[in-house]
Amino acid sequence: MEEPQSDLSIELPLSQETFSDLWKLLPPNNVLSTLPSSDSIEELFLSENVTGWLEDSGGALQGVAAAAASTAEDPVTETPAPVASAPATPWPLSSSVPSYKTYQGDYGFRLGFLHSGTAKSVTCTYSPSLNKLFCQLAKTCPVQLWVNSTPPPGTRVRAMAIYKKLQYMTEVVRRCPHHERSSEGDSLAPPQHLIRVEGNLHAEYLDDKQTFRHSVVVPYEPPEVGSDCTTIHYNYMCNSSCMGGMNRRPILTIITLEDPSGNLLGRNSFEVRICACPGRDRRTEEKNFQKKGEPCPELPPKSAKRALPTNTSSSPPPKKKTLDGEYFTLKIRGHERFKMFQELNEALELKDAQASKGSEDNGAHSSYLKSKKGQSASRLKKLMIKREGPDSD
């Protein structure tokens, strides 16, 4: 088959002269249906309105560019937005350490606790020998307030927690981050407060602006009819072993009796351990306390060192020599030598018997051995007499 020859008469519109012809071939409904002439184009770009608009636009653009350049060279200082205050340090240090010494005052203020055992099911128990309260997390801990005479009206009771050891006393006792974010507990109390009061709508949770310490204050109520003391129910909202919180550091709870002006009327304190099994921990610590024989735990932390046992010595105690219970057979040639070794063995047996047995047994045994020894001595004399005589054939 013959290939069709290309039509050379068709030329591509490669010049500006053919562009107007192609423009006329476009359909009439096209947006660009009419091609403007060269005169109209010149009038468009050379009209006074367009020229003024371009000049105004150019001036505006130049002004914007100049403003941008000046801004880049000399930045304008904007008024900063109010910055939020920095959060408080996780462990704020207090400027003063409250005292925890017992002070009964003029009203004979003292504390009391309910008698409870050491069973596994108990949720709160107090050890008088340790002056320590063992309780579970967020469980009711009744504390009794005893006074000899009624304080003045408006008296308040304050509860505050501090660390027991000297190196941590300046730190504020607060809950761990995990329990702070939890929604459990009283909504009236701040989430960072460790001690809370149960069943008292007049409780006030205070943060000291100078020491940053947390405390809860309730008005003092006289004992009810038929009762000798006032009871306040406290809750501890974090475990002693929580990381980021107490972190196994022992704490003390200070209960103070104050007048309306804040003057101290009485003070008392006790150690607290918040754990999962209060009864078990109380038994363990009381046994350790009895074994160590430490002084009273109410003494200052400086004297809380472990006392060395008095019976310690560098050299071990001498060991008693134990008699060997084995028996051996010794072959001896000659009857005379046998008698001599027999007497020596009996003498050693007598010495051992005197060292091990009492005087009564030793007396009977020695008399028996002496009689036997006397018989052996007489036999030895007879043998010597026979040897002194003439030899027989």
Curated annotation (Swiss-Prot):
Region described as Interaction with WWOX:
66-110
Q: Which residue numbers mark the site Interaction with DNA?
A: 120
* Modification N6-methyllysine occurs at: 370, 372, 382
PROSITE patterns to which the protein is assigned, alphabetical: P53 (PS00348)
Superkingdom, taxonomy of origin: Eukaryota
Motif Nuclear export signal — list its residue ranges.
Answer: 339-350
[KR]-[STA]-K motif, short sequence motif: residues: 370-372
Q: Which residue ranges are recorded for the region named Interaction with CCAR2?
A: 1-320
Show the SUPFAM superfamilies listed in the entry. Answer: p53 tetramerization domain, p53-like transcription factors
User: Residues bearing Phosphothreonine?
Assistant: 18, 284
A GO cellular component entry from the record: centrosome
Annotated region (Interaction with USP7), positions in chain: 359-363
Post-translational modification N6-lactoyllysine, affected residues: 120, 139
Residues in cross-link Glycyl lysine isopeptide (Lys-Gly) (interchain with G-Cter in ubiquitin): 24, 291-292, 351, 357
Which residue positions does N6,N6-dimethyllysine occur at? Answer: 370, 373, 382
Region of interest called Required for interaction with FBXO42, as start-end residue ranges on this chain: 113-236
The places in or outside the cell where this protein is found are: Cytoplasm; Nucleus; Nucleus, PML body; Endoplasmic reticulum
Return the InterPro entries for the record: p53-like_TF_DNA-bd_sf, p53/RUNT-type_TF_DNA-bd_sf, p53_DNA-bd, p53_tetramer_sf, p53_tetrameristn, p53_transactivation_domain, p53_tumour_suppressor
Q: Where is this region: Interaction with HIPK2?
A: 319-360
Point to the regions of Polar residues compositional bias: 364-378
**Which Gene Ontology MF annotations are present?**
ATP-dependent DNA/DNA annealing activity; copper ion binding; DNA binding; DNA-binding transcription factor activity, RNA polymerase II-specific; molecular condensate scaffold activity; promoter-specific chromatin binding; RNA polymerase II cis-regulatory region sequence-specific DNA binding
Domain text: The N-terminal and C-terminal disordered regions undergo liquid-liquid phase separation (LLPS) following homotetramerization and activation. Post-translational modifications, such as phosphorylation or lactylation affect the ability to undergo LLPS.
Functional summary from the UniProt entry? Multifunctional transcription factor that induces cell cycle arrest, DNA repair or apoptosis upon binding to its target DNA sequence. Acts as a tumor suppressor in many tumor types; induces growth arrest or apoptosis depending on the physiological circumstances and cell type. Negatively regulates cell division by controlling expression of a set of genes required for this process. One of the activated genes is an inhibitor of cyclin-dependent kinases. Apoptosis induction seems to be mediated either by stimulation of BAX and FAS antigen expression, or by repression of Bcl-2 expression.
Q: Which disease is it linked to?
A: p53 is found in increased amounts in a wide variety of transformed cells. p53 is frequently mutated or inactivated in many types of cancer.
Provide the family line: Belongs to the p53 family.
- Protein name per Swiss-Prot or TrEMBL: Cellular tumor antigen p53
